[in-house]
Amino acid sequence: MAVPKKRTSKTRTNRRRAQKKARAPQFVECPQCREKKLPHRICQSCGHYKGEEIIEV
């Protein structure tokens, strides 16, 4: 079985783990109703996506 030749330092381990942090979701404004929504998603309040009504709300 493969075994590491050198011990991984705390700094190297922490640097690797720093990429796994949780980020706050970025919201954008819906151009139709001005509500906050997630990017590249249908607006939950008006049902529009890319200027077209996808679902009736």
UniProtKB/Swiss-Prot annotation:
UniProt region (Disordered), positions on chain: 1-23
Record keywords, A-Z: Ribonucleoprotein, Ribosomal protein
Any one Pfam family match given in the protein's UniProt record, by short name: Ribosomal_L32p
GO BP terms in the entry: translation
GO CC annotations, alphabetized: large ribosomal subunit
InterPro entries xrefs: Ribosomal_bL32, Ribosomal_bL32_bact, Ribosomal_zn-bd
GO terms for MF: structural constituent of ribosome
Family statement drawn from the similarity comment of this UniProt entry: Belongs to the bacterial ribosomal protein bL32 family.
Name this protein carries in UniProt: Large ribosomal subunit protein bL32
Organism encoding this protein: Natranaerobius thermophilus (strain ATCC BAA-1301 / DSM 18059 / JW/NM-WN-LF)
